[in-house]
């Protein structure tokens, strides 16, 4: 079967980010500058949302818009999803995709773990991650895809513009 539901977390390490020497405008837009690739991945795997209900709370000196995010929705394919992030607490990026027989866990995003139905065990899946270890994870293949001839799998500007509507909903609550 296919995806029956999914969830994702885009918690950022505020204690580290506040120390970074970045322009204030970059930090004020940190969700767009650094967190959206997690959201992109979740919606790439689970499907594009047709409805999102979003909540936000808190705020930080360097990111006053919000520091805690929570929400849920349904995709164009009628798959339910939820998300959360708390930039004031410990956490990490992650995506979990559920099917009728498996829970696929991307935490860290570069690794795949699987939990099978009827088991509480979670096992790492061996994947060819040589390029991710040699270069920044995902960068080599993304660059290769960018320069490939013919149809590639990168999103178009029009698709990115549509994705930005989802990012705005998540950010604005």
Language model: regions and residue ranges:
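A short, polar/proline- and glycine-enriched secondary-structure boundary/capping micro-motif
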Residues: 4, 91-96, 115-120, 124
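Active-site loop of classical SDR/Rossmann-like NAD(P)-dependent oxidoreductases
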Residues: 106, 130-144, 155-158
């Amino acid at each position: 079967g296919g995806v029956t539901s999914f969830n994702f977390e885009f918690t950022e390490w505020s204690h580290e980010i506040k120390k970074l020497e970045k322009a204030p405008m970059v930090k004020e837009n940190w969700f767009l500058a650094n967190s959206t690739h997690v959201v992109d991945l979740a919606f790439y795997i689970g499907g594009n949302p047709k409805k999102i209900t979003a909540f936000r709370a808190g705020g930080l000196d360097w990111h006053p818009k919000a520091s805690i995010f929570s929400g849920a929705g349904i995709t164009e394919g009628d798959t339910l999803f939820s998300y959360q992030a708390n930039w004031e607490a410990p956490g990490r990026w992650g995506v979990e995709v559920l099917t009728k027989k498996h829970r696929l866990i991307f935490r860290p995003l570069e690794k795949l773990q699987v939990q099978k139905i009827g088991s509480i065990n979670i096992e790492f899946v061996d994947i060819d991650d040589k390029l991710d270890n040699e270069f920044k994870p995902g960068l080599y293949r993304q660059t290769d895809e960018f320069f490939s001839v013919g149809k590639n799998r990168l999103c178009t500007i029009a698709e990115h513009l549509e994705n930005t509507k989802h990012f705005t909903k998540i950010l604005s609550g």
